[in-house]
């Protein structure tokens, strides 16, 4: 329970009135619970989307659902996506890329990445053939994002500074990664049957390609690339689901 509270405090803005000392060893072992942080985020997203959908048109409810995640996370990983785009696409050397990611200012690549991310994300939600599924998508996709993050933790080489937040998860054992994947697959299978499981295969393929690209550019992961990977992972999952629903 302490590990779950730490993970909630780490990945969300939920004000828990509990002070727990950071134990990196137990946090790494307990990282298998990370998808349950996705459950909490997803439940909040679902609630906001559902309430707004009762009063407003579907596009407005979708925007509200997307904004709900920014509220509960503080835009933590959206900022990481912008920083990653600014750094990796800066056409600079490794050291300079890492410096750019640390810069609190958002560059042109970051702005472009965020704009197209949400345009594509919103368009995919509007493309879901069964609108009754949209609420469940808002619930499940944050779980997928945490599953992708766990995949990126596996045998991770850390490229950031030793003081970086992502370094806490350096050396995560293999078994929490496997448990996290099982949780994600159960969630996708429960809500979207075999199509959800097939879609996650596409997410895993994306994660492998993304990981290889990042390692080639900066020699490993850092906090920004980890966060960006989770954000893009849930986008890819939605893309695969919409694609499969159109084909099957």
From Swiss-Prot:
It holds the Pfam family CobS. Its cofactor is Mg(2+). The keyword Cell cycle does not apply. Disulfide bonds: none annotated. The keyword Glycoprotein does not apply. GO terms for cellular component: plasma membrane. Keywords: Cell membrane, Cobalamin biosynthesis, Magnesium, Membrane, Transferase, Transmembrane, Transmembrane helix. Pathway: Cofactor biosynthesis; adenosylcobalamin biosynthesis; adenosylcobalamin from cob(II)yrinate a,c-diamide: step 7/7. It catalyses: alpha-ribazole + adenosylcob(III)inamide-GDP = adenosylcob(III)alamin + GMP + H(+); alpha-ribazole 5'-phosphate + adenosylcob(III)inamide-GDP = adenosylcob(III)alamin 5'-phosphate + GMP + H(+). Its main location: membrane. GO terms for biological process: cobalamin biosynthetic process. InterPro entries: CobS. GO terms for molecular function: adenosylcobinamide-GDP ribazoletransferase activity; cobalamin 5'-phosphate synthase activity. It is found in: Cell membrane. It comes from the Bacteria. It is a multi-pass membrane protein. Belongs to the CobS family. Joins adenosylcobinamide-GDP and alpha-ribazole to generate adenosylcobalamin (Ado-cobalamin). Also synthesizes adenosylcobalamin 5'-phosphate from adenosylcobinamide-GDP and alpha-ribazole 5'-phosphate. This is Adenosylcobinamide-GDP ribazoletransferase.
């Amino acid at each position: 329970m302490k590990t779950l509270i730490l993970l909630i405090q780490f990945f969300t803005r939920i004000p828990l009135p509990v002070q727990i000392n950071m134990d990196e060893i137990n946090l790494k072992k307990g990282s298998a619970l990370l998808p349950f942080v996705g459950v909490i985020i997803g439940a909040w997203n679902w609630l906001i989307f559902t309430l707004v959908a009762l009063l407003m048109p579907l596009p407005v409810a979708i925007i509200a659902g997307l904004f709900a995640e920014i509220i509960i996370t503080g835009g933590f990983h959206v900022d990481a996506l912008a920083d990653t785009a600014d750094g990796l696409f800066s056409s600079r050397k490794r050291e300079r890329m890492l410096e750019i990611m640390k810069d609190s200012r958002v560059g042109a690549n970051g702005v472009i990445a965020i704009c197209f991310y949400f345009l594509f994300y919103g368009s995919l939600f509007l493309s879901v053939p069964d609108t009754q599924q949209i609420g469940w998508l808002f619930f499940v996709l944050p779980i997928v994002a945490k599953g992708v993050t766990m995949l990126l933790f596996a045998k991770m080489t850390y490229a950031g500074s030793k003081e970086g937040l992502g370094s806490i998860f350096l050396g995560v054992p293999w078994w929490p990664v496997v448990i996290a994947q099982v949780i994600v697959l159960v969630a996708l299978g429960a809500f979207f049957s075999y199509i959800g499981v097939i879609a996650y295969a596409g997410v895993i393929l994306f994660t492998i390609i993304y990981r290889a690209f990042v390692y080639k550019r900066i020699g490993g992961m850092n906090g920004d690339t980890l966060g960006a990977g989770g954000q893009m992972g849930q986008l890819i999952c939605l893309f695969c689901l919409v694609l499969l629903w159109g084909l099957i």
